[in-house]
Amino acid sequence: MTTWFPTIAEAARLVAERRISSYELTRLCLDRIQAFEPRLNAFITVTRDSALAAARDADIAIAASGPRSPMHGIPIAYKDIFETKGLRTTAHSKLLQDYVPTQDSTCVQRMQAAGAVSLGKTATHEFAMGGPSFDLPWPPARNPWDLERFPSGSSSGTAAAVAAGEILGGMGSDTGGSIRLPAALCGLAGLKATYGLVSRAGVLPLAYSMDHAGPMAWTAEDCAIMLQALAGVDPKDPASANVPVQNYVAEIGDSISGVRIGVVRHFFETDVSVTPGVQQGVEDAIRIFIDRGAMVRDITLPSLQEWNACGFVIMLTEAYAVHEARFKTRYQDYGERMRDNIAVGAFLSGADYVQAVRRRRELCTTMAAAMTDVDILLSVGANAEAPLMTEVGKWDVYREPLPTMPFNVTGYPTLAICSGYGSQGMPVGIQLTARPFEEPLLLRVGHAYERETTWRERRPAIAQTSNAAA
């Protein structure tokens, strides 16, 4: 079983049919964690004993009355900014290394209600922004496809753990691309749902008006299954959207014939330079969508530079507002990269913020108008394959616009999925974006693409090793 990598959908069917137990599945994942973690650094806290106990309880409940959801008995983990009752929540920072919340975040509560089994807390960039740092209490996560390379972030540990098969799915957060960038670089699926669809209550904030929480898993279908458990209004999150929870799984296998896809070609051809592997991935995706009956054409939006200038002013100003009090008294306890980011926010003025908010409204209006003529936007998930950890400075988000930022500015639902393998066999990805609250269509298009490729059949070499005994 050591080289068996079930998706959530596959494992859910096997658990429901009692062909495998949650306990066996959880043991498999925990044994991989034990084997890989000294090198991968995907986890900050592993809850082995409580996970096995929860898996046993799941098996008893499923034997008695069947699974209460497809997530029942499925091993997952949480980015270490999701508050967990009685379990430290560190934000990968010295400042919170001993912080133990007294209640669970809403996402944790909803996953528990669905029956998911938590294996622990995963590595992140400090406070979901600091970047990969070596001056923190825990080392940064590494990319399981090549341990000398960067997994991106800030949901780095969750992405690395999913790709390595340590968990079947996990929770991330996304303020400027922190779910989608690591999904692209680690070769998995990551969903930033519509702003307000998934509660952020109990998630340590970075930028209130741009923060999203969402699922990361091996496939678009798995993200849909997780979203089904997560979505819904929450009075504890002031930005929570009071909209009906749809069935995100029921139509995922339906045809995409007639779906109108707009390729934002300037995002990856003129606004920035992407690598040949990234370019090939998006061109191959276009051909697949056409073959499946979609109607594809190019569209134009404001440049990536405009989206990023607006987004970073808002993000950094709001991040400083979150950290101001602590920064003034304990600035030396932040890692260098996070300290520098907060300092930038400190020097932005109220006028800067107001101008960015005004421009944000204009940009949102422009995107809404563009999407009256198309159903889905197609762009790249990241501009390049994963860099070496020693060259991670080249990944500095201030050097080159992020392809992910436009959809944090607008809050539109966006899915990153693997679109192939580029330089030295490292994953590349595409992004698909839908109109607000059209996640069923978005996930259906992503699933249709994945069914036409063999990318989901590959796993990193670390995950093929035989020393993770099941």
Task: List PLM regions with ranges.
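Short helix-loop capping/hinge segments that flank enzyme active sites or metal/cofactor-binding pockets
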Residues: 71-91, 250-265, 314-368, 416-427
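Serine-dependent amide/ester hydrolase catalytic core
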Residues: 10-14, 28, 257, 269, ...
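Short glycine/serine-rich loop/turn segments
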Residues: 71-213, 264-266, 316, 320, ...
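Flexible, acidic loop-helix segments that line cofactor/substrate-binding pockets
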Residues: 41, 237-245, 259-260, 265-267, ...
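Conserved hydrophobic/aromatic pocket- or pore-lining residues that grip, position, or stack substrates
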Residues: 29, 51, 73, 79, ...
